[in-house]
From Swiss-Prot:
This is Sugar fermentation stimulation protein homolog. It comes from the Bacteria. PANTHER family: SUGAR FERMENTATION STIMULATION PROTEIN A (PTHR30545:SF2). InterPro entries: SfsA, SfsA_C, SfsA_N. The lineage of its organism: Bacteria, Pseudomonadati, Pseudomonadota, Gammaproteobacteria, Pseudomonadales. Belongs to the SfsA family. It comes from Pseudomonas aeruginosa (strain ATCC 15692 / DSM 22644 / CIP 104116 / JCM 14847 / LMG 12228 / 1C / PRS 101 / PAO1). Gene3D superfamilies: 2.40.50.580, 3.40.1350.60. One of its GO terms (molecular function) is DNA binding. It holds the Pfam family SfsA_N.
Length: 235
């Protein structure tokens, strides 16, 4: 996935009201841009950190740009635009780059399922039946180690999705929790038990119920993203 247009570099002044960020561009222009991330963005929003943003050509849009990338304190690039994760996964699915999920005959997005009114990010159809996928974007890395963690904030919704997937797996339906790691320099993924122990517990229970837990790491550059390789998940 290449960015639709060249990204511009700047530095972060502040993030506020969840969806807004003030930045200063490399040319000294101060802008308020859209922050497309509902998480805490731990390690992705230290004051003064380097950021990259895309500009909008839509004159009707209130904000002139969207925050796309951050440089973490460890010098890694993180894609903070969580909407990119689903697009990146779909691109990889259609290209056959996720070997464990290859061979499907149809793909649908945002499909309702479960008893808790959830929507799966993807439903794949195979000759043998359906498969449901929940995608999570991972950008959290605590230190110099090459292990990323999820979530970066307490997520009741994420735990609900795991319960729904586990229920499918118990019925004999393939269910997948897929972590799209949009952080460079990562070699493995784990649940962030120190942030949300309930989520970690739900993930382990889902895996025991038969949910397939997969993680794929992206090559993150200022030109684009590429879902490059499978990563181990340390439960």
């Amino acid at each position: 996935m290449r960015f639709e247009q060249p990204l511009e570099e700047g530095r972060l002044l502040r993030r506020y009201k969840r969806f807004l960020a003030d930045i200063e561009s490399a040319g000294g222009e101060r802008l308020t841009i859209h922050c497309p991330n509902t998480g805490s963005m731990l390690n992705c929003m230290s004051e003064g950190c380097r950021v990259w943003f895309s500009r909008s050509n839509d004159p009707k849009r209130k904000l002139p740009g969207t925050w796309e990338l951050s440089e973490t304190p460890q010098g890694r690039l993180a894609c903070v635009n969580t909407a990119r994760a689903n697009r990146l996964v779909e691109e990889a699915l259609l290209a056959g780059d996720i070997a464990e999920l290859a061979g499907f005959t149809a793909l649908r997005r945002e499909v309702a399922y479960g008893v808790e009114n959830s929507r799966a990010d993807f439903r794949l159809e195979y000759p043998t039946g359906a498969l449901f996928i929940e995608v999570k974007s991972v950008t959290l890395g605590f230190d110099e180690t090459a292990v990323a963690a999820f979530p970066d904030a307490v997520t009741l919704r994420g735990a609900k999705h795991l319960r729904e997937l586990a229920a499918l797996a118990r019925e004999g339906i393939r269910a997948v929790q897929l972590y799209c790691v949009n952080l460079s320099g990562v070699e493995a993924v784990r649940p962030a038990d120190e942030i949300d122990p309930a989520y970690g517990k739900a993930l382990r229970e889902a895996a025991q119920a038969g949910v397939e837990v997969l993680a794929y790491g992206a090559e993150v550059t200022t030109e684009g993203l590429n879902l490059a390789r499978r990563l181990p998940v340390r439960l």
